[in-house]
Structure formats: structure tokens, C-alpha cells
Amino acid sequence: MAVLPPDPVFTLRCPEMGAVNSLCFHQNERLLAGTIKGSVFLWDLQTNRSLLHFAIGKEPITTLHHTEDMLISQEKGGAVTLWTLGNSGYKRHFTINANYVGYCRSVLHANTNADDDHLLFYPCEENSIGVLHLNDVENPSQILVPDDAQLPKLGTLTCFKPFECASQLFVLAGYESGHFLTWDLSSGMVVDVLQMDADPMCLDYDPLANRGIVGGPCK
């Protein structure tokens, strides 16, 4: 007999919220929920009440991240927006129109080689990766474009994972074709190509154990 899951400790409900598409915590006492209607709801986990909500756009919110004082949202369609937190709520600070229509989610990475620097990795165009330093958003993003003629046909970018090895920063990226490219951020070059099953949907990698896992539509 299957073991039933435990009952929730509490349930957060709001008639205006609707279906939730993404979640992230802020300082362990607040939960932000991005909805398919394009809004963000901020919940206080001490009172279980929604402190505020605001509209980002009309597209579903696919990903949310939060630093100490900044919210990052990614919408279906690729728009990535940075929001600053003030006394009156969140204010739009910077928007990147990444022009990406797939399901790959952005990733926030704490740069251990520089204090107080977070790197935002986001999908852009069909198969490129943008890299933005959050402490200097006015500078153009670094764009990793797989335009080497020797590379196989990749299709759409579907997932990626930044990781550090020997004090160097790399990105392992999966594509529709099932190819996985390892990018060296210092040079912006591909240093390894691996062929696996087509249509990877998510991945994780532990550089210490040198082990990774890939999830797809069938397994």
C-alpha cells in the first residue's frame, strides 16, 4: 500500500493569485510566488498572509530569484527584469528582452571569486546564454553563442548549470538535440561536447563528486 504524503503545515491561499508557476524564498521568512497571470505575490511565513502583490506583465512568470535587496523575474517569452526593494515595495530597475520562447529557466550563481557579486545566467535567442553581473548591470551581458562551424546542430537551449572547478567558472548547457556543451566563462569558448538523449529538460552537476544527473520527458 502506498504511503500517503503528510498533510501540509499550512496552506497559502488568495483568490486573486490563481495558479502558481514559480517560487523563491527571501530571508527564510518570506515566500514569493510567480503566477501564470504574470503577477508576483509576497507571503509572510510568520502570519501566512500576503503582504503585497504586483503585476510584472501578461506572460507567466517562469522563474524568480532574490538577493538581499533585489528581485529577479523571468517571464515566458524571455524578458528578464531586475526589481529593487524599497520602503514602498518593488520598483522596476532594469529589463533584458532576451527573446527566448523555450522552457529553460534562468540561474542565479554566487560568484565565490568576488565578494557580493552574483551572476545571472539566462537563456536568450534560440540557443545562447547571457551572463549578467548584478553589481554592474549597466555593462553589456556576456553572451555565449554556439556559432562554431564544427559544432553539431543543437536546436533550442533547454537547461544549464553553472559550476566552479579549480577556481574557474564553467557552464554545462543542454540542448534540444541531446548535446551538452561545457563553456569556459573566462574565454567564452566550448571546452567539451557530450552526446546524450534528445530533449533534456533539467540537469544538475556536482564538480566535487564529478557526477551529474539529467531529467528528460521520458525518464
Task: Walk through the language-model features, giving the residues of each.
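Beta-strand-rich domains and repeat architectures in extracellular enzymes and scaffolds
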Residues: 11-38
